Structure formats: C-alpha cells, structure tokens
Amino acid sequence: MTIDTPSWVRDAVFYQVFPDRLARSGRVEAPGELESWEAEPTTHGLKGGDLYGVVAHLDRLRRLGVNALYLNPVFASASNHRYHTDDYYRVDPLLGGNEALRELLDEAHARDMRVVLDGVFNHSGRGWWPFHHLLENGVDSPYRDWFHLSDEVRAGTRAISAYPSEEQVAEISRRHAAGAPFGTVSREVLGYEAWWDLPALPKIRLEHPPAREHILDASESWIRFGIDGWRLDVPEEVTASFWREFRTRVRAANPEAYIVGEVWHHKPEWLRGDMFDAFMNYPLNRALLGFAAQDRLDPVVPLPVEYEGKIRAYDGAGLWAAIQELDAVNPPEVTAVQLNLLSSHDTPRFLTFCGGDLDALRLATLLQMTLPGAPCIYYGDEIGMAGSADPDCRRAFPADPGEWDHAPSEWVADLAGLRHSSRAFRDAELSLLGTNGAAVAYLRRDGDEAFAVVANAGDERLRWDVPLTLAAPEASVVPIRGGAAGERSAAIVDGALRIGLPGRDGMVVRLS
C-alpha cells in the first residue's frame, strides 16, 4: 500500500494550544464569574481563554518559528478541556463560537500557518443532544442505538443513571479495585457504556450507521471549513474500519489533511497509509526525557500510566538505540511526520519532570528540532513554564511578558530557524556518527548540505574526535543561543570532527 503523508508536515513546527489557557481577548463576554487567570488551575475551573486570544499570539509564534497550531478541543462542552463534546458542529461560545474559529483560520493561513483540531469521536459529553434525548425518552428515543446500552435499559426495565448516586460511584470503584478493567463496568452499573467508566463520557456506538455518519460528516465539514487536519483522541478505542472510512472522507475533502492519533506506544499496523499519518511520539518523548534529564528526574512528579516503568536515564548509545527502534517499526514517510513533543496536556511539563533543569530542556529541544518528525511545542514551554500532573500542567499563560523566562524562546527560535533554513533537518538522511558515554553525535545530510548534531548530557566538558562518514574540509559551529554558547568549538582534524563541548550542552556543526 502506498503511504501518502502530507508534504507540509515535514516543514512544520507545531505549537499546542490549550484554548482556555493561552489568552483572554476581551472580545468574548463571559456569562458569569471565571476562575482567576493567575490562580493555580483546578479540575473544573474555566479561566476564559478564547480563540481570539490565540489570534493575538500568532505574530509572536511566527517569530518563534511556529508555522502550525494544534488546538485541544474547541467544540461546545461543559468541561474546561472540552473533551466532553456537547455539539460536534458548534465551537464553544466561551471560545468565541464558529466566528472566532473562522477568524483564527483566516489569520493563521494569511501567515502561512496550518491549524489542526482535536477530534473526540470515541465518546461524547453527557450534554450531547442525542444522549439528552435518550435521557428524556428512554428506549422510545430514536437515538437509543447511538449508544451502548445494557439489556435492561434496552428492554425498558430500568433507566439510565447518567448522574449516578454515591453508591453507584462506589460500586464502580469497588469493581475496579477487584480487577475489572476500566470501561467494562459502567454498562452494568449505569445502564450505558462510558469511556473508562466515567459517567460524563458516554461511548458512541460508531458501528450504528446514523451515529457513524454524524461523526464522519462533522469531521469532513470542518475540513471543508478550512482546518488542516485532525488529532484524534483515544483512537485505539475505535475500530480500524471506522478510521479507514474516516481517512477516505477527510482526504477526499483535503488530500493534504494531517491525521495524527493519540497512541502512546508502537502500533505500526495503523501507520501503513490507510488510517493515520502519524502518532503523538510519546516513545521518543520518553527517550529524550531519559537522556536529557539523566539523574535530574524529579522522583515525586506523578507519572502518566503509560510512563510507569518506562522512564530511565539513557546514555548516548541508549538514546540512539531508542531512536533506531522507532525507525525500525515505521517507514521513513511516517517518521518524517511523527508529532515529536516534549510536553502535553496529559503529562507533567518537561521542565518539571527534570526538576526545573533548563539545560535538560535545552538539550531535549536541540534533539527535538534536529531529528526527523514535526516538533511540537506545548504552550508555555518556550517561556519556561512549570507544571506537574493534570491540572497543574494546564496553567494559564502569563499575560505579562515580564513574568516570562525569555531564554527558552531564544534557543527555540534559533533551532526552529535552523530547521526551516535547511531540508537536511526536515526530510533527509539521519545516521549515527558516534556515542561517547552520555554524549551522542549524528549526521543530517541532504545532498551537499550536511550538519553534525552533538549533545552532551554529561556534567563534564567533552573533547571528542568524532569519526566522519563524509569528506568535510571545514566545520563551523552554528550560532544557537543558550548554555555556554561561546565555549563550543569544532574543527576538522585528520578527517575527524574534533569538538569541544561543555557539560550539559549541545551544538550543531555545519560541515562544508
């Protein structure tokens, strides 16, 4: 099967936006009191960020080197993260409604920036109107087949418990504690299947043609509205046949639409050209974290379930082995468009994982920007924002630039600019030059243009004659701000690349 991934993603530097937390524009009138912007985030509090606020940041992001946005869900919802969808055709009024998304798309596209939205199609919110219709009418509702109901509900002998009692909540917890897998209890206890047995998230019965068509039509409609792709939430909960049809419909509307799934591990059979273009690259994220942090990993930071037992310190050889493992399971067309992230709304921030060590964040950013795949910056990482597990990783972006740490923005801008300046970093050969303890050196080469990337995660200054696989008469250090920029050196000596690099630092060397 031909693997056809969008060409523009190879050139993309993404910026992930949590819409409620980037900026209040003042153009959306709140219906009531909001949570203080400066206060620590709470599980349910809304801070009032909106899509017009995202528009106000576009010029800053363009200067940073960003040319693509990934937005967490924007559709009408009763939750601040909006993974509880109430209407798949309507942008949340608190974000400015459909008009605000129209303006964001127009302003982004005018700046040659793409916009990818988050699609939550496995489950809806409890406020989705077909589910409300079912609550009001029971089995007499024509929407009864849109959801996974218990036999008793379908027979009309019991009602759905969408707002369960304390006893029902306790029963769900008791069954989980006894070993029942998440997602298997709610149908019996509540009368309907809910994602992870969370009552607010009824699972959609996508094998039912009208429900399936509703979701597929909404997905296609927003592509025609002008979005440039979909990031898809918990796609493994949905059948492969649905995603094949989804891809056919979406790609018919826009042959260059990007389809990226939230999959936390290897699943190469879904990346063969008939479903997804790419995944959120959490395996690479874990490897970069282990290499850049070394012994600085904060042991008290809560780990996502998918990270438990998988975070460890990597030396240079270990990092390269992890990279090679990913390359072995994915064809190059996929590797080139993987969404390479350091932080997300589902993980503690990279800087917090590393105990606040800015050198670790800088090293990881160097690797993220120079390895194959599309780098994705989580809002606020570029100004040194901290944040532990959800909801702490979803703090409000400081409105006052005086509160920002500008150093990360400087190295992000330099590295993104370097990536944009040469195809060698975007869609070209990657090969190992060597490893040396906690250091790694690799080559990015596109025709006559070649760069060596060297990262030293160790504490000591490194003097290393790196063997070269090409003839290079000259070597020059590419200026990148941050760290000990003035103490990096490189020269060609007897056919090798002799580098001098401080501890906890990295560099890019142009070979000519």
Where are these regions (language model features)?
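N-terminal structural segment of carbohydrate-active enzymes
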Residues: 1-117, 122-134, 138-141, 145, ...
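Hydrophobic faces of well-ordered beta-strands that scaffold small-molecule active sites
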Residues: 13-15, 69-71, 115-117, 230, ...
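Active-site-proximal helices and loops of the catalytic beta/alpha 8
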Residues: 105, 109, 122-123, 131-139, ...
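Carbohydrate-binding surface patches
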Residues: 433-471
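C-terminal beta-strand-rich structural cap/linker in extracellular carbohydrate-active enzymes
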Residues: 491-512
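Aromatic/acidic polysaccharide-binding cleft in carbohydrate-active enzymes
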Residues: 20, 273-274, 278, 336-344, ...
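Core domains of carbohydrate- and sulfate-ester-processing enzymes
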Residues: 129-197, 201, 291, 299-323
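The substrate-binding groove and active-site-proximal loops of carbohydrate-active enzymes
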Residues: 39-51, 84-98, 198-211, 227-237, ...
